[in-house]
Amino acid sequence: MARAEIVSHEPATGAEVWRGKVGDVEEVVARARRAWPAWAAQPLATRIELVRRFANEVRKDADNLATMISRETGKPLWEARTEVDSVVNKVEISIRAYADRTSQRKLDSALQGTAALRHKPHGVLAVLGPYNFPAHLPNGHIVPALIAGNAVVFKPSEKTPATGEMLAQCFHRAGIPAAVVQVLIGGPEEGQALVAHDGIDGVLFTGSAHAGIAINRKLASNPGKIVALEMGGNNPIVVWDTPKIEDAATLIVQSAFTSAGQRCTAARRLIIKASMFDEVIDHVKRLADRIIVGAPFDDPAPFMGPVIDNRTADGLTESFVYLLSSGGRPIKHMVRLQEDRPFLSPAIIDVTAVADRPDVELFGPLLQVVRVDDFDEAIAEANNTRFGLSASLIGGDPQDYNRFWANIRAGVVNWNRPTNGASSAAPFGGVGLSGNHRPSAYYAADYCAYPVASTEVDQPRASIGVGLRSD
């Protein structure tokens, strides 16, 4: 029986990008398990040298990789190039993080001998990647996993398999054995089989809350399998007292509409002091009206491209209509710019009057606005979500920011900066439906190896001082 195929298409044109056979989960995992012991036995210095060679391979192939990212995701070429840069930069960050978080340590001990802390790799880790950053985000799991001595089975999103293949080829050209980094092509069925496979020692996931919760439930009875979930957000950006209205508007637009709103840290909700509403919204709308929406390689370069596919675009337009029918007031309508392709104009809607605002991640260029009268109300509204990934305060004074930081429930909290664009040199993750307290980026080293505490003496020496009869 012939194996099914996965086909990826350009969001911008509908043209076929890539096709390939669906992988065999059993074969891929068995190959990884056979390869893992030899990889784990390599000296750390060797593994580090090989991931550095990987960074060099990415540099050499940067133009081709960026072009493929743009074709498969629809993001502008300038943005795809920044993603490739992030892939390269992640290597040295991961090396530093491994040394900082999981290096061998001697510990104080009241006992004779030595107390030590060392780390061991888990074994074979499954990395499940998203489509919005199909190289950078899975790479942020793969590189730390390899440094720690794990083998990796990488399942890219079925919407961006070609980028996943190109990334894996860079690892292989660097000298990392093909069985140590494998790509599993497939859809949700293959992903579920991989997660549940007994030969997988851990799952490192980036994607939607819906899929992450399903993984968590599936593995609830298997506590020995490490699970790191980086999920989405219903992120607030709060605008308070500031005279710098143009800068505030720019930060709002960057937060909401970069990557066509397809970032887990994108601002979904603008919470604004009522007395500032008219002036701020006027500036935001005028700036949003100037946004160029276009294909990845257009000239002049677009600010944002299409969303990933027509189904996603349909869902976003339906969500906008739902908010309108529920009492929302349109500030800037969402428009389908091309009937048969998923190009959407950035949309802004005042939902202050909507009684039951949906607490979901609307993964696209749709910004909801809520007016409030005092700062405590702003904080309460910002926290009015099951998610907890990113939040920003624009304006206010240091005392306001201290209150904001202390009371906001999120893993990333910024002041006068966008909600997106987090540093890879810091931990990255959220709480609630945004993650399971295993932040990625700098702290990825923590879940790629487990700690082993030891007390050690070079010769056995022992005595029992009490509780024994005399000879």
From Swiss-Prot:
Q: Note the superkingdom of the native organism.
A: Bacteria
Q: Where is the signal peptide?
A: none
- Reported EC number(s) for this entry are 1.2.1.71
Q: Which CDD domains match?
A: ALDH_SGSD_AstD
| Enzymatic reactions | N-succinyl-L-glutamate 5-semialdehyde + NAD(+) + H2O = N-succinyl-L-glutamate + NADH + 2 H(+)
Q: Where does NAD(+) bind?
A: G207, S208, A209, H210, A211, G212
- A Pfam family this protein belongs to? Aldedh
The catalytic site is made up of E230, C264
GO BP terms, alphabetized = arginine catabolic process to glutamate; arginine catabolic process to succinate
Q: Name one GO molecular function term.
A: succinylglutamate-semialdehyde dehydrogenase activity
Q: What does this protein do?
A: Catalyzes the NAD-dependent reduction of succinylglutamate semialdehyde into succinylglutamate.
Q: What is this protein called?
A: N-succinylglutamate 5-semialdehyde dehydrogenase
Identify the species of origin.
Novosphingobium aromaticivorans (strain ATCC 700278 / DSM 12444 / CCUG 56034 / CIP 105152 / NBRC 16084 / F199)
